[in-house]
Structure formats: C-alpha cells, structure tokens
C-alpha cells in the first residue's frame, strides 16, 4: 500500500514538472519553416557536386548521380 502511494506521488510530480517546463518552451523555436529541411540535411551526410556517388544509394545532396558516378 505504501509503495503504491509513493508511485502515485512520483508520477504526479513528474507530470507536474513536464507541464511546467512545457509552458516555458512555447514559441521559442525560431525559423520554423527551415526546421524540416535543415534537420534532414544536417542529420544525414550527402555528397557535393563532382564527388563520387553511387546511383542506387541516392547519396548526393541533389539526389542526382550521373552516368560517370559523379554528383550533379
């Protein structure tokens, strides 16, 4: 019984902490439109033009690999 009460109190405390910090973080994200595109390009490495590429991997930043296996 004691353990159940402690678990309930801890869960309520952690929930309250999350709600308090969620209020502080509202409207702090800048450049919202850029987030999805820059996040993808920063999280994956891509090859710049004239670097060696592989057509079946799509590893060029432009997603275009020519027949000489160079990024366009």
Swiss-Prot record:
Effect of residue 51 to A: 13-fold decrease of toxicity
Domain of life the protein comes from: Eukaryota
Record's comment on post-translational modification: This toxin is not amidated at the C-terminal Val residue.
Outcome of substituting residue 54 to A/M: Loss of toxicity
GO CC annotations, alphabetized: extracellular region
Annotated transmembrane regions: none
Result, substituting residue 55 to A: 3-fold decrease of toxicity
SUPFAM superfamilies per UniProt: omega toxin-like
GO MF annotations in UniProt: ion channel inhibitor activity; potassium channel regulator activity; toxin activity
Propeptide: 23-45
Impact reported for residue 48 to A: 3-fold decrease of toxicity
Residues spanning the signal sequence: 1-22
Tissue specificity of this protein: Expressed by the venom duct.
Site (Inserts into the pore of the channel and blocks the flow of potassium ions): 52
Mutagenesis / variant outcome for changing residue 62 to A: 1.5-fold decrease of toxicity
Disulfide bond residue pairs: 46-61, 53-65, 60-71
Family: Belongs to the conotoxin O1 superfamily.
Function: Kappa-conotoxins bind and inhibit voltage-gated potassium channels (Kv). This toxin inhibits the drosophila Shaker channel (IC(50)=57-80 nM). In vivo, when tested in fish, this toxin induces hyperactivity, followed by continuous contraction and extension of major fins, without immobilization or death. Injection of this peptide together with the delta-conotoxin PVIA causes the sudden tetanus of prey (STOP) syndrome, which is a single, lethal 'fin-pop' in envenomed fish. When tested in mice, induces hyperactivity.
Miscellaneous: A free N-terminal residue (not acetylated or not cyclizated) is necessary for optimal inhibition of Shaker potassium channel. Negative results: has no effect on the rat Kv1.1/KCNA1 channel. Does not inhibit Kv1.3/KCNA3, Kv1.6/KCNA6, Kv2.1/KCNB1, Nav1.4/SCN4A and Nav1.6/SCN8A.
Name this polypeptide is given: Kappa-conotoxin PVIIA
Species assigned in the record: Conus purpurascens
């Amino acid at each position: 019984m004691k353990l159940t009460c402690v678990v309930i109190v801890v869960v309520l405390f952690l929930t309250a902490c999350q709600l308090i910090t969620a209020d502080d973080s509202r409207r702090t994200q800048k450049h919202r439109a850029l987030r999805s595109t820059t996040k993808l390009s920063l999280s994956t490495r891509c090859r710049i033009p004239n670097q060696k590429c592989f057509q079946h991997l799509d590893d060029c930043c432009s997603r275009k690999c020519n027949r000489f296996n160079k990024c366009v």
